Regions:
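Active-site-adjacent, His/Asp/Glu-enriched structural segments that form or flank metal-binding
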Residues: 60, 73-157, 189, 195-201
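M16/insulysin-pitrilysin zinc metalloprotease superfamily fold
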Residues: 76-79, 110-143, 313, 317-374, ...
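A structural supersecondary motif
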Residues: 267-272, 290-333
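Scaffold signal of the M16-like zinc-metallopeptidase fold and its non-catalytic homologs
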Residues: 2-6, 151-203, 222, 374-407
Length: 443
């Protein structure tokens, strides 16, 4: 979507029904996009400001800067200090937070519909006008180091991080979002501020709002807030969705962290599909049947029939040009060989035999329910339209997505299984294994 857009132009992305579910987009000067979805039966609104920059975009000298910056933007602006930022929203019964992902960062708030002006003003102030002072950098450095320490104490988190590192090597998409102790200690104020001013531009930003709102009012509020910050200028031309990124080459291998844990944690998997691959719906059904719930093959075989683990599931992650398909299990260290054999056997059986009609039906049902039930509140609706506007060329309606799920055929599932599940495997393990050799698992 690289064509020039007329400043202030408004497009209806989805017509909705009976005044509900109407999704509209306005493009402002500088390429800032405002997307809203009407939910007239609720009394709340969710506001998100999405910036198309994530940990994947970091150069080696910036590792951890995206997440560091997310913290710093809440420390203060010329008009609000950290206490005033949080109190402005919490004092009206709302919530405010942010998160950093591999390919984007989001700042969001949820408030009563009557308090929409406050939420927009505070978030815009945070995103456009952070001071990023030396004092704040040093103060927040300690907070982030504590966050890394907390994360490192949870092996179920670390094993997923180790899997990504083994899968993608030392490329940016394989690095931890938080950075490392070493990289955080090396990041200085000047480097972070330069990163902020380079990437936090209107053409990379989407403001998404869902709830009991009028699109015109939202556009007016956003325009006023961004103009006050001097952040609206230039042609209304926004950055197109990314189609690739640095360092997404897949590797095969084993990564073992020897730790004296009571439970072993493992992820066995490979690369998945990109978020625009049409086969993603078939892979979603396959994933649901293989390890998506208590009725899935892996859960039944590993936990229900053999009692080898408490937690066992499969998952998919999708990025611009690659993805992940993984199987996670937490088990007693003495049971890991049995668990890995079951995982390999079930993957091989799916490739050789496909899924039964009953499994396909349950997999589709799980995907349908997960989609629809996940859109019952303003926050999830805001996230859906904001993320879709930032990373896709189009916004598929819920009915369109449901139709794509229902249209998945057994042959399509078989074809995607033969592709994805036959790719070179990668294994990450955390547990008391010393120099135990797991290389046979990935051959």
């Amino acid at each position: 979507m690289s064509e020039r857009i007329i400043e202030g132009s408004t497009t209806t992305l989805h017509p909705g029904k009976d005044g509900a579910g109407v999704v509209r987009r306005t493009v402002l000067p500088g390429g800032l996009r405002v997307v809203t979805e009407t939910m007239p039966t609720v009394r709340s609104v969710a506001v998100g400001m999405w910036v198309g920059i994530g940990s994947r975009d970091e150069a080696p000298e910036h590792m951890g800067a995206t997440h560091f910056l997310e913290h710093l933007l809440f420390k203060g602006t010329p008009t609000r200090d950290a206490m005033q930022i949080s109190a402005s929203i919490e004092g009206i019964g709302g919530e405010i937070n942010a998160f950093t992902a591999k390919e984007y960062t989001c700042y969001y708030a949820r408030v009563l519909d009557e308090d929409l002006p406050i939420a927009v003003d505070v978030l815009a102030d945070v995103v456009t006008s952070s001071l990023v002072t030396e004092e704040d950098v040093e103060s927040e450095r300690g907070v982030i180091l504590e966050e890394i320490a907390m994360h490192d104490d949870d092996p179920s988190d670390v094993v997923h991080e180790q899997f990504a590192a083994a899968l993608y090597g030392d490329s940016p998409i394989g690095r931890p979002i938080l950075g490392t102790v070493e990289s955080i200690n090396e990041l200085g104020r000047e480097r972070i501020a330069e990163y902020y001013h380079r990437y936090y531009r209107p053409r990379r930003t989407v403001v998404s709002v869902a709830g009991n709102v009028r699109h015109e009012e939202v556009v007016e509020l956003v325009t006023r807030a961004y103009e006050r910050a001097g952040a609206l200028s230039g042609p209304a031309e926004f950055a197109p969705p990314r189609t690739s990124g640095p360092g997404a080459d897949q590797r095969s291998g084993v990564r073992v962290l020897d730790r004296p844990t009571e439970q072993a944690n493992l992820v066995l998997g490979t690369t998945g599909l990109s978020r625009t691959d049409d086969r993603r719906f078939a892979l979603g059904v396959l994933n649901a049947a293989l390890g998506g719930g208590m009725s899935s093959r892996l859960f039944q075989e590993i936990r229900e029939k053999r009692g080898l683990a408490y937690s066992a599931y499969s998952y998919t992650s999708a990025y611009a040009d690659t993805g992940q398909f993984g199987i996670y299990v937490g088990c007693l260290p003495s049971k890991i060989d049995d668990v890995l054999k079951i995982c390999r056997d079930e993957v091989s059986r799916v490739v050789a035999e496909g899924l039964s009609a009953d499994e396909i039906m349950r997999g589709k049902g799980q995907m349908r329910g997960g989609l629809v039930l996940g859109l019952e509140d303003t926050g999830s609706r805001m996230s859906r339209i904001g993320k879709n506007e930032l990373v896709y060329d189009e916004l598929m309606s819920v009915d369109e997505v449901l139709a794509r799920i229902e249209a998945v055929t057994p042959d399509e599932i078989g074809e995607v299984a033969a592709d994805v599940l036959m790719r070179p495997l990668t294994l990450a393990v955390i547990g008391p294994y010393g120099d135990k050799d797991f290389t046979d698992v990935v051959r």
